[in-house]
């Protein structure tokens, strides 16, 4: 599908299977692109310095949510560019962003600090589940949180002392699958879990 040198990754498909959104450094920065899979035509979604990745379409295909870093200070910008030149990023300070599928109405969804990432739409399309360590004093643990698409009504979902991330709903909204290193006997194993979801 892509053949450019560099980083083309983190791809997900629209619900109708006609489009793909992915992260690429083809511009010299890590930006999001939407590709029509039939024609191969692309649209660049993001245009601001920082890492934009991990994007998902809403269930109706009309919106996109993703994680992004936005280095602001001269020191942070310098560090980001130096790491990027080596093909690296430091994903420690990220917020969630949302926009329409055509790139319009782009806005920041969270302003929590630390790392807010792995967002996924609830099947009704009105809420987003994501992983965050914003309540952690030392960067750990990560728990799952739910937030409305307008940035209101933040709610904590899991209460783990380890790592919960990569949430995915079943299409009917009855089940939630996620990755966690809970119940691993103190080791570093990360396993998959599934839970019944009740609104």
Label every PLM stretch briefly.
Residues 2-8, 23-33, 46-51, 67-95, ...:
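A flexible loop/linker signature enriched in serine peptidases of the S9 family
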Residues 15-16, 59-60, 123-124, 171-172:
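Residue-level detector of Asp-centered blade-edge/turn motifs that repeat once per structural unit
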Residues 36-40, 100-104, 148-152, 197-199:
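Short loop/turn segments that connect beta-strands within beta-propeller blades
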Residues 125, 173, 193-196:
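Gram-negative outer-membrane assembly/targeting C-terminal domains
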């Amino acid at each position: 599908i892509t053949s450019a040198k560099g980083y083309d990754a983190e791809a997900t498909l629209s619900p109708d299977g006609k489009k793909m959104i992915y992260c690429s450094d083809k511009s010299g920065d890590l930006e999001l692109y939407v590709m029509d899979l039939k024609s191969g035509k692309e649209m660049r979604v993001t245009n601001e310095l920082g890492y934009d990745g991990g994007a998902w379409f809403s269930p109706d295909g009309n919106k996109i949510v993703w994680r992004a870093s936005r280095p602001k200070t001269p020191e942070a910008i310098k560090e980001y560019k130096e790491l990027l030149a080596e093909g690296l990023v430091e994903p420690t300070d990220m917020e969630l962003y949302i926009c329409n599928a055509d790139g319009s109405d782009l806005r920041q969804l969270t302003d929590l600090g630390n790392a807010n990432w792995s967002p996924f739409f609830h099947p009704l399309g009105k809420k987003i589940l994501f992983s965050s360590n914003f309540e952690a004093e030392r960067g750990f643990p990560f728990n799952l949180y739910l937030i409305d698409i307008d940035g209101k009504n933040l709610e904590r979902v899991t209460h783990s002392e380890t790592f919960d991330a990569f949430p995915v709903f079943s299409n009917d909204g009855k089940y939630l699958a996620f990755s966690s290193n809970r119940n691993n006997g103190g080791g570093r194993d990360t396993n998959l879990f599934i839970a019944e979801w009740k609104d």
